[in-house]
Amino acid sequence: GVAKAGAHIRKKEERYVQNAIQSGIQGVFLHGMFFTVWLAVLAVPLAQTIDNSVGILLGEMFTTGSSMVLWALLLFYCSQILKLSGKNHLLLLGYGVMDLVFVITSTILFRMENAGILSIVLGSVIGMAAGAVCLCVILCLQRKTRPDALRGLAIPAGCCCACGLLAFGLEKLLFPHVGAVVTVISELIITLLLYWFLLLLLRCLRGQDFQYIPGGRLMRMLGKMFRL
């Protein structure tokens, strides 16, 4: 998505830039929300897959910081587009907001809750969210575009909830019998395919969107397979 949008920016094809950025932001929310829910639900099996000796603490960190996936993707995408547009000075504003919010929230949470490392994780989430939203707003204002609230937020959020419930049920069913590794891999494949199917079924994506969204070709193949 970044590469194709950057190509349109360099060629000064303004009529394509808005569509590319809108589809790119939509793609960020589509995949960011899915992996946020997936990480939150499967925090314990994933933590035990990485290091079983600190599985409980690592699981709490994954659960608390799961939304960082979404904000990191949004921050990266908006940063790259603004950089390609020659708006480096605006990046300083976004990252300045992120650092300031992180320091303030981490300090407050650490003193109030005395949660140790979890206060830093939560502060990082809040700070990154503030920076990502700030850069996203700046980018939309600069390019005079805005995300589609229905196709970019509402429908994916509903699909993520459905996949999250399925992942929760499968985790309770599989984890005690097949272990952490098999549970994590199998649930990732099953829930991701279901998520893509629901997005296609609900017409969340249009023809041009597949060009700018990671995995767009695979999603289009899945749609043709089920005639969606």
Summary of predicted features, one role per range:
Residues 168-228:
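Membrane-proximal transmembrane or re-entrant/amphipathic helices at the cytosolic face
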Residues 77-86, 136-151:
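Alpha-helical transmembrane segments
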Residues 56, 86-136, 165, 169-189:
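Membrane-interface helix-loop junctions in multi-pass transport and translocation proteins
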Residues 30, 34, 63, 93-97, ...:
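Hydrophobic residues within alpha-helical transmembrane segments
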Residues 18-53, 59-73, 103-104, 108:
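Alpha-helical transmembrane segments of multi-pass membrane transport and lipid-handling proteins
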Residues 1-4, 27-28, 35, 207:
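Small-residue-rich midsections of specific transmembrane alpha-helices
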Residues 1-13, 18-25:
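Helix-loop junctions and terminal segments of transmembrane helices
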